[in-house]
């Protein structure tokens, strides 16, 4: 005799549903937003089929780092096209590897990276990304002013080595900094690294790494260190934190990519103002 009830495991209620409530998070009436619950449900959905973790995330980051270290020795970066391509290629390769890993050993990019499935989800994620991107940009400008006021630097601009690039390549670089780099970096940091840490739950060793706030802080710090720009470290940590909030609230790299793009708006536009 077949027991009545849903046969699809995804339709079953949470394991704690039949128990007395132990804390407020078990209730949708506690004031958490719909985006919060969607992020929670996406995280739970990912864990079932996710067979990649910290080693896979480390491989993606290692490929990115190896590309940035090796390409200057392999191509002539004094050439404008080669220089621009040298900036793009390592991140494109790393993001491509991330997509391969999620397709072969995970649930696929749509689930593992929380890609929106409906227009309403797209809208919600874009709105969250714009809001937190604006916070990242405003806070970053304030921190930069405070840091530069107390720091004696000969070259305070990370764009100084871009002077002399012809306009067509500047436009290509603007598009990369504004859209391409945010997408690739979010796949690496708030996609792979975030997902690898997020799946560490009890009884796994070092399950504390799966705490959402630990994940947020770790990804923000690694993101800042990865850019290797000393005086901008605090600016980048704040940016990573604000961008990560967009990821945490929505469960999607679309929101964090949008926030990252908003945060990169001024640097992208600044490139066009550089003398040829």
Task: Describe the residue ranges of each PLM region.
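Residue-level signature of transmembrane alpha-helical entry/exit and packing/kink sites
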Residues: 49-57, 80-88, 121-129, 169-174, ...
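Intrinsically disordered regions, especially transient/low-confidence alpha-helical propensity segments
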Residues: 13, 19, 25, 29, ...
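Alpha-helical transmembrane spans of integral membrane proteins, capturing the lipid-embedded, hydrophobic core
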Residues: 57, 61, 65, 88, ...
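Basic, gly/Ser/Thr/Pro-rich low-complexity segments located predominantly at protein N termini
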Residues: 100-103, 111-112, 119, 134, ...
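Juxtamembrane helix-loop-helix connectors linking adjacent transmembrane helices
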Residues: 75-86, 110-181, 199, 203-204
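Transmembrane helix-loop-helix hairpins at the membrane interface
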Residues: 165-276
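N-terminal, membrane-interfacial amphipathic/helix-forming hydrophobic leader that caps
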Residues: 1-125, 141, 145, 179, ...
